[in-house]
């Protein structure tokens, strides 16, 4: 083969502008079929869901070499791009030279030409990117990341890197992964018999972050508008299709935004991401819709059609209580003060309003200490964006900007002042109204791909009893 000829991506070759030209394509064999005279090889290089058909005239190739071209093998092909004679593709490559880079033994290669369950593919997460399904998901994942950066960059917000190792529990959930270099077989002890973390690497107890919000707020108080986008960690022992121990979060924090502005930003942001997916990932979305979720494209368009409903928590509870009176059955009870379950959120979105909902003004007891207290003294300016199929997709609030009120709320919620002294400083010096929210990246991907298990939208899922690869 001509080593100097530049490789053409299959996605570019399929556009048809190169018909009649000699091209060099490389990729992995999906299938091979044929007869004694000719072989048809379906080749994929990851640039598109679509394969390139390679037509190999067996009179021109060594039989031993051709026998090594099996599903999973990696090959390079030089040939002429021509309009296809057969159905199923518009163009194909008439091969003049083939080089085999790597073989795949059909006796052991697990991705043969047949359907595989998602459960099976999770067990071989190192190979599942080679399937059509996961190629589509990972391309969409890339595009959603680009959409997020583009949206905030165009807004004039700055990408801010919050630390992954932290000494604070932002959410007060207590489900954090500890970071330590201490030897468990010979732990240093204080006089009281407690582990002496002063002897640890950081000189104190540290954990992996559950959120970059608090640090993000510090940056917003100087840069005006920022967003974080990085991994977060929760040591929550939940083996469900909605939970991961390691996932990615997008968290904008913006000075001078009040709760109404925050809701507007969240709606504009999520609609931008969905529109980006429809504009840039339609081939992959169509494939996933056909195979996993026939209503996917309609659901994506549904989000874009109308303004999101703004709904106070108290009114939401009234609607749900009314539904129960009218015979609707919920697994979890409804009462003022309850933290809504996914079934309640989905009822409001899918049945009652038939449009996404932004719920606001939650009871202070079920929300975090940093949320701004309303004048009623009972509710806070929290807001959750509720979506069809998945329930809550975004959670945020206007932050408490008043130093005394923030200290009082921290004490109320059992958050020690000594642990958040630096956070309180932002209210002590030049405080300002500000707001923000968090979007779980994988939650967004569940919605955009139509997949039903969160372990299928991240390359290597980390869950209880599973840290393979």
Curated annotation (Swiss-Prot):
The keyword Ribonucleoprotein does not apply. It is an enzyme of class 6 (ligase). It catalyses: tRNA(Asn) + L-asparagine + ATP = L-asparaginyl-tRNA(Asn) + AMP + diphosphate + H(+). GO terms for cellular component: cytoplasm. Its EC number is 6.1.1.22. SUPFAM superfamilies: Class II aaRS and biotin synthetases (SSF55681), Nucleic acid-binding proteins (SSF50249). GO terms for biological process: asparaginyl-tRNA aminoacylation. Keywords: Aminoacyl-tRNA synthetase, ATP-binding, Cytoplasm, Ligase, Nucleotide-binding, Protein biosynthesis. It comes from the Bacteria. The keyword Aminoacyl-tRNA synthetase applies. Belongs to the class-II aminoacyl-tRNA synthetase family. PANTHER family: ASPARAGINE--TRNA LIGASE, MITOCHONDRIAL-RELATED, ASPARTYL/LYSYL-TRNA SYNTHETASE. This is Asparagine--tRNA ligase.
């Amino acid at each position: 083969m001509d080593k100097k000829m530049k490789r053409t991506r299959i996605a570019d070759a399929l556009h048809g502008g190169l018909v009649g030209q000699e091209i060099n394509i490389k990729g992995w064999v999906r299938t091979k079929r044929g007869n004694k005279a000719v072989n048809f090889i379906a080749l994929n290089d990851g640039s598109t869901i679509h394969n390139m058909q390679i037509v190999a005239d067996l009179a021109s190739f060594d039989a031993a070499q051709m026998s090594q071209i099996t599903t999973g093998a990696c090959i390079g092909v030089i040939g002429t791009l021509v309009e296809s004679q057969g159905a199923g593709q518009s163009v194909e490559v008439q091969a003049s030279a083939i080089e085999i880079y790597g073989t795949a033994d059909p006796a052991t290669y697990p991705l043969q030409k047949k359907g595989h369950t998602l459960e099976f593919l999770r067990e071989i997460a190192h190979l599942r990117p080679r399937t059509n399904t996961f190629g589509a998901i990972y391309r969409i994942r890339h595009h959603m990341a680009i959409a997020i950066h583009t949206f905030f960059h165009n807004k004039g917000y700055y990408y801010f890197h919050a630390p992954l190792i932290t000494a604070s529990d932002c959410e007060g959930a207590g489900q954090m992964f500890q970071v330590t270099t201490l030897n468990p077989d010979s732990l240093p002890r204080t006089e009281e018999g407690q582990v002496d973390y002063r002897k640890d690497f950081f000189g104190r107890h540290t954990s992996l972050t559950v959120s970059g919000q608090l640090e993000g707020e510090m940056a917003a108080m100087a840069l005006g508008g920022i967003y974080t986008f990085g991994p977060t960690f929760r040591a929550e022992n939940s083996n469900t299709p909605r939970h991961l121990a390691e996932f990615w979060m997008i968290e904008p924090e913006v000075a001078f935004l009040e709760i109404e502005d925050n809701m507007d930003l969240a709606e504009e942001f999520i609609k931008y991401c969905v529109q980006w997916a429809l504009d840039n990932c339609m081939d992959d979305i169509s494939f996933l819709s056909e195979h996993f979720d026939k209503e996917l494209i309609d659901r994506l368009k549904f989000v874009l059609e109308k303004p999101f409903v703004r709904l106070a928590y108290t009114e939401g509870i009234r609607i749900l209580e009314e539904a129960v009176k009218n015979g609707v059955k919920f697994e979890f009870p409804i009462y003022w003060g309850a933290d809504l379950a996914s079934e309640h959120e989905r009822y409001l979105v899918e049945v009652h309003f038939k449009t996404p909902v932004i719920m606001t003004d939650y009871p202070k007891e079920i929300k975090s200490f940093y949320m701004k207290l309303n004048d009623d003294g009972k509710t806070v300016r929290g807001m959750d964006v509720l979506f069809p199929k998945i329930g809550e997709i975004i959670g945020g609030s206007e932050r408490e900007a008043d130093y005394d009120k923030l200290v009082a709320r921290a004490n109320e919620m059992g958050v020690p002042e000594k642990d958040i002294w630096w956070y309180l400083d932002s209210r002590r010096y030049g405080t300002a109204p500000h707001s923000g929210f968090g979007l779980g990246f994988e939650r967004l991907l569940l919605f955009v791909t139509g997949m039903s298990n969160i372990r299928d939208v991240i390359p290597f899922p980390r869950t209880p009893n599973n840290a393979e690869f």
